């Protein structure tokens, strides 16, 4: 018996697919970024939803799927930490940014995203409690099981967004758990003026 075939180069695309659908984001014609691109599931999802261009940014190298590397709409930015991205690294303001990073807090990524977004730019980010909660709140194998820690992490990121130039438009569960079964959250934000 076979399950459904994933329509993206990785299951990560299913996370962004849910966010685009549930938050009503339509990236058709958009210039986008995919921070933490890895294999490119988010990049693939954006392209399949009409993105004009995607900057696929990742600190690693050799991970982005071959079909995306060869797509003229994709700018592969390997060995690049989004945290240190500057305006001159991209040709146009971003209409949309996705963030799916590990081992770093969103609090270090979001100020950079805000600088690169257009005045009406939006973003969908994965909130990963295991990278936001602090070591004392992360259990065995890097799993956060305490519901109260999840709540405090989500509240912290929402507050950070609101206090750092973003409006929060939506919040939901990710349809796929992270490694080791971590529950992750999707947040939809928009640059406030």
Pin down the residues of each PLM region.
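Short alpha-helix
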Residues: 150-164
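Short, glycine-/aromatic-enriched active-site segment of Class I SAM-dependent methyltransferases
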Residues: 129-146
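A short glycine-rich, Lys/Arg-flanked "PGG" loop and its adjoining helix->strand segment in the class I
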Residues: 107-124
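Conserved class I S-adenosyl-L-methionine
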Residues: 28-38
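S4-like RNA-binding module at protein N-termini
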Residues: 1-25
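Core SAM-dependent methyltransferase catalytic element
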Residues: 176-193
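Conserved SAM-binding loop of SAM-dependent methyltransferases across substrates and taxa
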Residues: 39-50
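S-adenosyl-L-methionine
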Residues: 53-108
């Amino acid at each position: 018996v076979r399950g459904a075939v994933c329509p993206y180069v990785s299951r990560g695309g299913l996370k962004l697919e849910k966010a685009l659908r549930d938050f009503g984001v339509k990236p058709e014609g958009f210039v986008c970024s995919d921070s933490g691109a890895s294999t490119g599931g988010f990049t693939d999802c954006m392209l399949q939803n009409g993105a004009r261009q995607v900057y696929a940014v990742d600190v690693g190298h050799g991970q982005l799927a071959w079909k995306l590397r060869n797509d003229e709409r994709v700018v592969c930015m390997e060995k690049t930490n989004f945290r240190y991205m500057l305006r001159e690294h991209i040709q146009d303001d971003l209409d949309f940014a996705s963030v799916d990073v590990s081992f770093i807090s969103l609090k270090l990524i979001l100020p950079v995203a805000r600088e690169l977004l257009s005045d009406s730019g939006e973003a969908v980010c994965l909130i990963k409690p295991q990278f936001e909660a602090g070591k004392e709140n992360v259990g065995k194998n890097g799993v956060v099981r305490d519901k109260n820690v999840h709540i405090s992490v989500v509240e912290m990121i929402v507050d950070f967004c609101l206090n750092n130039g973003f409006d929060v438009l939506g919040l939901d569960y990710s349809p796929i758990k992270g490694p080791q079964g971590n529950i992750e959250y999707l947040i939809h934000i928009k640059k406030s003026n």
